[in-house]
Amino acid sequence: VFLHGYGQSRMGWMTTPDGREGWSTSFLRKGHGVFLVDQPRRGEAGSTAAMTTDSIDTWSEDSKEYMPGDQAWYTHFRIGRVAPERYEGSQFPAGEEAQDQFFRQMTPNTGSFDITVAAAAMDEVMNDVYEMTGQKSIYVTHSQGGAVGWEVDPENVAAIVAIEPGGTPEIGSEQYNALLGANIPIVIYFGDYIDNGSEDIQSTSFWRTVRDTAVQFAESYNA
C-alpha cells in the first residue's frame, strides 16, 4: 500500500517526470499486489500554475494550507538551488520537459490536511486490503504520508517503509508504543543534498532536523 506526500498524488508512484515506469509497475512486475491511495481532500488534478508569496520560501507556519510555487518545490525536493540549475551529481532527470512534468505532478489540497481523517481512511484501506488478500500490508509512505503512516492502527500492517518521512513518532508517545508493541519492522530512507544544501533555504534545516530526529527514533526503536 503506497501513500504519497504533501502536494502530491498517487501519480508519483506511477511514473517518473521523464516518463519511465514508476514504483507501482516495478513492484507489479515482481509479482506484488499494489494499492495506490490518494489522501482525503487530494486528487489527481495537478497544478499548471500556483501562487505563492515567496517563490524561494519552502516552509511556512501555516503549512497545512500553504501551496508552494514551482521554485519552492524545486528547492524543497533538493533538486537544486534555483531552477533549472541542479546540484552536482543529481540523478533527477535533466531537461525542461522532465522539470515541467515534475511541477505538473504537484497537486493542491481541496481542503485542509487533517491527520485524523487521513489516518482513519488509511485504516479502512488496510482493512479492505486484508479482506481482499488475507495478508497484512507493507505500508510505503512518503514525506507527509509518513505522518499518517505512524497514526494507522498496526493491526493489519506487516511493515512500514518510510521514504523521507516529514517526522517520526516521539519516543515514548502513543504512536511509538503502538508500533513497538506490535513489533512492526520499520525502515526509513533519506536521500542526498541534506547536509550540503543552501543555508538560506529554510527547508535545508527542516530536512536536517527531520533526518536527525529519525536517527534518534531508529536507535531507540531498535534498542
Predicted feature residues:
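Extended, charge-rich helix/loop segments that form flexible
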Residues: 67-113
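Hydrophobic anchor at the start of a short beta-strand
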Residues: 34, 137, 186, 223
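Short, surface-exposed "cap/lid" segments of acyl-processing enzymes
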Residues: 2-83
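Gly/Ala-rich beta-loop-alpha elbow adjacent to hydrolase catalytic centers
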Residues: 140-149
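The feature captures the conserved acid-bearing segment of alpha/beta-hydrolase catalytic domains
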Residues: 159-222
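Aromatic pocket-lining residues of Rossmann-like dinucleotide-binding sites
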Residues: 27, 152-153
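Conserved acidic catalytic loop of the alpha/beta-hydrolase fold
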Residues: 115-137
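The conserved beta1-alpha1 loop
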Residues: 3-5, 38, 142, 164, ...
